[in-house]
Curated annotation (Swiss-Prot):
GO terms for biological process: mRNA processing; RNA splicing; tRNA processing. Disulfide bonds: none annotated. It is found in: Plastid, Chloroplast. This is Maturase K. The lineage of its organism: Eukaryota, Viridiplantae, Streptophyta, Embryophyta, Tracheophyta. GO terms for cellular component: chloroplast. PANTHER family: MATURASE K. It comes from Pinus pinaster. Keywords: Chloroplast, mRNA processing, Plastid, RNA-binding, tRNA processing. Belongs to the intron maturase 2 family. MatK subfamily. Pfam families: Intron_maturas2, MatK_N. InterPro entries: Domain_X (IPR024937), Maturase_MatK (IPR002866), Maturase_MatK_N (IPR024942).
Length: 515
């Protein structure tokens, strides 16, 4: 690996590196063996772990030889093929080889990512999802439309292998990758598909494939956008999985006007901003409706011709920022632009200028949230709280914890709004629904539940707001806090409520395009 790092700066390194000899390093399989035992021991009882789980390096080499001798040229256009690896897909040695394959492929990929980031001195990274809110406040006031483009996670295995061949010419090292991809493609759930559906499982191999696939898409897409956005900076942010990045590209690429007019995608005075959380990118655009349609068409054509993948039109939808809600990340976000007039006066009143800027004012979309709460059986369609009957079998602490988790995430996300009336209404619905759920469980009334539990009823639940409001502000800071927003972000992951809303929105869009 040290040799890879020494050669990483050479331009020809990506075309000459050889990874196949690494498959026969015993230390590599010792690492993968220990990792496999750590994962399996957490999911299997101790009596199932025996001395048979000892690794034999000779067996590993024989398995690699069988993988290399497989011929996948006959399964490019068929749905199923007898694969010797499929029978022992879940066996001990196949899992060890899969772990080793991931380690080998991560070596050049990590070096490539390191030097690509080091070469961009103008980029700054923040490893936190909290940076998404400064991005929204900084970029959204200068935009009027949003493209919500979902990254397709279904792709033919041969396309993935060929994308690796662009920067790895060591063909033998890609034979195990091709074998594993076709193995999962020929699994029972994918027999009727011509493309591989990457399982949504938290394995290191598939997370690596997903991150590589997203990186490949974005690296090529950004180069195209830079060319089309002549003499304009391109800002983008990336938040893959739990490792979140936010980058602001400050340099300006200048093209001649003659060359810009020749290009199909030479956009006049464009402002394009890109942010992604998980598999849901958001592109904020300032421009006419024709520009938004061109960008949407470009994304669809880019996926179709570069990855040979038909992308459904509903996976890239556009809407105006001032009229529609957007999801970022997974929650509702409705923005109202408030114009701010600033007058500047020069010395001796020789010059006076009026500047007009926009300020982002997030709004709590109370109607869509009530509709979502009604779908999840917390209230009816008019917003009247009801008991959550499916939770009556839980303990009192579990019920309070679940309501507390939903309220905490909603409050942290929408606490930056000036107008909190809608937020307090949501709190009322959740608190009364929690009380009705406890009353239904104990077969009593809300008054009896409050009388028996007393102040302990909501002492634990809905306490996050009190912690937030009781922060030690000074008198001047407290007065300023009434005028300014304070983002209090604590969203390590999207809760089931937001995921449920996202599924409803996706289903509505799919039904709209099916009609």
């Amino acid at each position: 690996m040290d040799e890879f790092h020494r050669c990483g700066k050479e331009d020809s390194f990506w075309q000459q590196c050889f990874l196949y000899p690494l498959f026969f390093q015993e230390d590599l399989y010792a690492i993968s063996h220990d990792h496999y035992l750590d994962v399996s021991s957490s999911s299997r009882p101790m009596e199932h772990l025996s001395s048979n789980d000892q690794l034999s390096f000779l067996t590993v080499k024989r398995l690699i030889g069988q993988i290399r001798q497989q011929n996948h040229s006959i399964v490019l256009f068929v749905n199923c093929d007898p694969n010797p690896l499929a029978d022992r897909k879940k066996s001990f040695y196949s899992e060890s080889v899969l772990e080793a394959l991931t380690l080998v492929l991560e070596v050049p990929f990590s070096i490539w990512s390191k030097y690509s980031v080091e070469g961009m001195n103008e980029c700054k990274s923040f490893r936190s999802i909290h940076s998404i809110f400064p991005f929204l406040e900084d970029k959204f006031p200068h935009s009027n439309s949003i493209l919500d483009a979902r990254i397709p996670y279904s792709i033919h295995p041969e396309i993935l292998v060929r994308t690796f061949r662009r920067w790895i010419r060591d063909a033998p090292s890609l034979h195990p990758l091709r074998s594993v991809l076709y193995d999962y493609r020929n699994s029972p759930e994918n027999l009727q598909r011509s493309i591989i559906v990457v399982p949504r499982v938290n394995t290191r191999f598939f997370l690596f494939l997903l991150n590589y696939y997203v990186c490949e898409c974005e690296s090529i897409l950004f180069s195209r956008l830079k060319r089309s956005s002549h003499s304009r900076p391109l800002s983008h942010g990336s938040f893959p999985q739990r490792t979140h990045f936010h980058r602001k590209i400050k340099h300006i690429i200048i093209f001649s006007r003659r060359n810009s007019l020749k290009s199909i995608w030479s956009l006049k005075d464009p402002k394009i901003h890109y942010v992604r959380y998980g598999e849901r990118p958001i592109i904020a655009i300032k421009g006419a409706h024709l520009l938004v349609k061109k960008c949407r068409y470009y994304l669809l054509i880019f996926r179709q011709f570069y990855f040979h993948l038909w992308s459904e039109p509903y996976r890239v939808c556009s809407h105006q920022l001032s009229k529609n809600c957007s999801s970022s990340p997974g929650y509702f976000l409705r923005v109202r632009m408030n114009p701010i007039f600033v007058r500047t006066k020069m010395l001796d009143e020789l010059f006076i200028a009026d500047l007009i800027t926009n300020e982002m004012d997030p709004i709590v979309p109370i109607v869509p949230i009530i509709g979502l709460l009604a779908t999840e059986k917390f209230c009816d369609i008019s917003g009247r709280p009801i008991s959550k009957l499916s939770w009556t079998s839980l303990t009192d602490d579990d019920i309070l914890d679940r309501f507390d988790q939903i309220w905490r995430n909603l409050f942290h996300y929408y606490s930056g709004s000036f107008d909190r009336d809608g937020l307090y209404r949501i709190k009322y619905i959740l608190s009364l629904s929690c009380a009705k759920t406890l009353a239904c469980k104990h077969k009593s009334t809300i008054r009896v539940v409050r009388k028996e539990l007393g102040p302990e009823l909501f002492k634990k639940s809905f306490s996050k707001e009190r912690e937030f409001d009781s922060l030690p502000f000074s008198s001047k800071a407290a007065a300023r806090s009434q005028r300014e927003r304070i983002w209090h972000s604590d969203i390590p992951q999207i809760n089931p409520l937001a995921n449920s809303w996202q599924k409803i929105q996706d289903l509505k869009i799919e039904n709209l395009f099916d009609q």
